[in-house]
Swiss-Prot record:
The chain crosses the membrane at residues 11-31. It holds the Pfam family ATP-synt_B. This is ATP synthase subunit b. Belongs to the ATPase B chain family. F(1)F(0) ATP synthase produces ATP from ADP in the presence of a proton or sodium gradient. F-type ATPases consist of two structural domains, F(1) containing the extramembraneous catalytic core and F(0) containing the membrane proton channel, linked together by a central stalk and a peripheral stalk. During catalysis, ATP synthesis in the catalytic domain of F(1) is coupled via a rotary mechanism of the central stalk subunits to proton translocation. Component of the F(0) channel, it forms part of the peripheral stalk, linking F(1) to F(0). It comes from Salmonella arizonae (strain ATCC BAA-731 / CDC346-86 / RSK2980). It is found in: Cell inner membrane.
Length: 156
């Protein structure tokens, strides 16, 4: 029975050891393991959320970039249209100014031509009168002289 008493004593000691471990050692170990599992699960969930947030941020950045490019294209097209409009307005204005200057120059030329004709008529009239005076001085034949004067006046 010695052998049985030893086995029985060892079994009782083992049962007490297991009970002690289950009562005092096992709960803190399980709590530490559960805490660690929770931390790992939270870390994985956080990493997954960060990955999803990164994907959303990439998609948002891509959309914003597309919108910015579209807006830039619209602005460039508007600027090109405005440039063409300004060029057309400048060409039209320059053409109008050119037409105005040409018309003004032609008017000045015509006025100068009229003034020169008038001056020439005055000089011709003075010469005609001087010629008539000389003709009258040389001859007193009025019929011939009046015929000459009439021809001069008709030419003027």
């Amino acid at each position: 029975m010695n052998l049985n008493a030893t086995i029985l004593g060892q079994a009782i000691a083992f049962i007490l050891f297991v009970w002690f471990c289950m009562k005092y050692v096992w709960p803190p170990l399980m709590a530490a393991i559960e805490k660690r599992q929770k931390e790992i699960a939270d870390g994985l969930a956080s990493a997954e959320r960060a990955h999803k947030d990164l994907d959303l941020a990439k998609a948002s950045a891509t959309d914003q970039l597309k919108k910015a490019k579209a807006e830039a294209q619209v602005i460039i097209e508007q600027a090109n249209k405005r440039r063409a409009q300004i060029l057309d307005e400048a060409k039209t204005e320059a053409e109008q100014e050119r037409t105005k200057i040409v018309a003004q120059a032609q008017a000045e030329i015509e006025a100068e031509r009229k003034r020169a004709r008038e001056e020439l008529r005055k000089q011709v009239a003075i010469l005609a009168v001087a010629g008539a005076e000389k003709i009258i001085e040389r001859s007193v034949d009025e019929a011939a002289n009046s015929d000459i004067v009439d021809k001069l006046v008709a030419e003027l």
